[in-house]
Curated annotation (Swiss-Prot):
PANTHER family: 4-ALPHA-GLUCANOTRANSFERASE DPE1, CHLOROPLASTIC/AMYLOPLASTIC, 4-ALPHA-GLUCANOTRANSFERASE DPE1, CHLOROPLASTIC_AMYLOPLASTIC. It is found in: Cytoplasm. This is 4-alpha-glucanotransferase. The keyword Transferase applies. Keywords: Carbohydrate metabolism, Cytoplasm, Glycosyltransferase, Transferase. Belongs to the disproportionating enzyme family. GO terms for biological process: carbohydrate metabolic process. Its main location: cytoplasm.
Length: 500
């Protein structure tokens, strides 16, 4: 896949500024798109948009297809008289997910009651048409969420056996008893997709493409695992027998045990990879390009026995990545995927990526810990430039935070390397812009930078600490924090490096 020479910014919608505790798909999102356009940017990258649960991670979602109701802008519904909005005193600059949960769900339910009382015939018709059109995933998701609520939030594999096993009589009775709750969860999805669709149309009108993010694995407690246990390695109780993760390495003696159930690739292949085709189809309704997290798992994945508390006991198991991407190519033509190819990357993984012409990733924070052979140093990027260069990702510290904890060797090497590229800095606060300049100067077709680096923020603005169970995903922009001066500086840098 060929990318234009361009740049973009990474900002998850929850991080947008505004009232009511979390960024939403409203005027602040449109303001950000206009800022990006003025700055000369052509891409907006987001994290996964699915509904989040315990831990608030976008990478552990209740659904592979649904959108996050937290992102719904309630102000248009308040203007229609469906809901009254009162800010309970949300903090500025951070998402308080406990407070958000306690406020937003009741507000959404009030909006649903208002909709039922006051909606026009056209709106009712539009909602009914959405439910019918999306029934192939929406029915399972809405019932899953309604049942979850009815069972105190318990994961599906701890529900009563007839519901766990999806016995026909139990499902029929649940749909009848919980019809209002099911309709409510369908309503939240209608609102989400309507608002996201309007935002995507605005991005397209401004010449901005949206890069989405898709986790390779799905969460154990998700509608898909409940509805299609045959796709996963589960026992009779519906619990995973083997789980996903990565092996021990330099950074972790015990590796990482993510806990996601692993696919039964033989079953998915027999079904023509229909789950993956539909997943990608849905993603491409939302985005123009899709970054797939942990791309190496399509070549081989680390399989950990579910009984093991760490990732040490795992083993590599081959996956049918080539067959899957051939099928994707048949269906979509060009494969609109960016490969997150970080971590344990073998020649086989590189061959799979290159066979389908998928752009990989380069992270500048990884470039300075050894010598000139480091593949993250820009002079080592492939001449075709089919890579996306980042200062850091959501899993990294901010660039200023990283620099403050870098070794003296890394700092000295970085300063020398930047000087070789004609880039100098005096204060540590200038380091994020120096690295952004380096990425812009490189042959990488696309450069994408976290907004925290545009603002030269420290570790207090870090989005995620991998392995830390709580306190992540909370950083937010303050109103007016991104200024026209930031935009002008980005535009000048893009113009000087031929990225406009």
């Amino acid at each position: 896949m060929e990318l234009p020479r361009a740049f973009g910014l990474l900002l998850h919608p929850t991080s947008l500024p505004g009232p009511y505790g979390v960024g939403v798909l409203g005027r602040e999102a449109r303001d950000f798109l206009r800022f990006l356009k003025e700055a000369g940017g052509r891409y907006w990258q987001v994290l996964p948009l699915g509904p989040t649960g315990y831990g608030d991670s976008p990478y552990q979602s209740f659904s592979a297809f649904a959108g996050n109701p937290y992102l719904i802008d309630l102000r248009p519904l308040a203007e229609r008289g469906y809901v009254r909005l009162e800010d309970p005193g949300f903090p500025q600059g951070r998402v308080d997910y406990g407070l958000l949960y306690a406020w937003k769900w009741p507000a959404l339910k009030e909006a649903f009651r208002g909709f039922k009382e006051k909606a026009s015939p056209e709106e009712r018709e539009a909602f009914a048409a959405f439910r019918e059109r999306e029934a192939w995933w929406l029915e399972d998701y809405a019932l899953f969420m309604a049942l979850k609520g009815a069972h105190g939030g318990l994961p599906w594999n701890r529900w009563p056996l007839p519901l766990r096993k999806r016995e026909e009589k139990a499902l029929r009775e649940a749909k009848s008893a919980l019809a209002e709750e099911v309709a409510f969860h369908a309503f939240t999805q209608w609102l989400f997709f309507r608002q996201w669709g309007a935002l995507k149309a605005e991005a397209e009108a401004l010449g901005i493409r949206i890069i989405g993010d898709m986790p390779i694995f799905v969460a154990e407690d998700s509608a898909e695992v409940w509805a299609h246990p045959e796709w996963f390695h589960l026992d009779e109780e519906g619990r995973p027998t083997v789980v996903a993760g990565v092996p021990p390495d330099y950074f972790s003696e015990t590796g990482q045990r993510w806990g996601n159930p692993l696919y039964r690739w033989d079953v998915l292949e027999r079904e023509g990879f229909s789950f993956w085709i539909r997943r990608l189809e849905k993603a491409l309704e939302l985005f123009h390009l899709v970054r797939i997290d942990h791309f190496r798992g399509f070549e081989a994945y680390w399989e950990i026995p579910a009984s093991c508390p760490t990732a040490v006991e795992g083993r590599w198991v081959k996956a049918p990545g080539e067959k899957l991407f051939q099928k994707i190519q048949e269906v979509f033509g060009e494969v609109p995927v960016l490969a997150e190819d970080l971590g344990v990357i073998t020649p086989e993984v590189e061959a799979l990526r290159d066979r389908f012409g998928l752009p990989g990733m380069k992270v500048l924070q990884f470039a300075f810990d050894d010598g000139m052979e480091n593949p993250f140093l820009p002079h080592n990027y492939p001449a075709h430039g089919r890579v996306v260069v980042y200062t850091g990702t959501h899993d990294n510290d901010t660039t200023l935070g990283w620099y403050r904890t870098a070794t003296p060797h890394e700092k000295a090497f970085m300063a020398r390397y930047l000087a070789d590229w004609g880039i100098t800095f005096r204060e540590e606060e200038e380091v994020p812009w120096a690295l952004m300049h380096l990425g812009m100067k490189s042959v990488a077709r696309l450069a994408v930078y976290p907004v925290q680096d545009v603002l030269a923020l420290g570790s207090e603005a870090r989005m995620n600490y991998p392995g830390r169970p709580s306190g992540n995903w909370a950083w937010r922009l303050l109103p007016g924090e991104l200024s026209p001066e930031h935009g002008a500086r980005l535009r000048a840098m893009a113009e000087a490096t031929e990225r406009l």
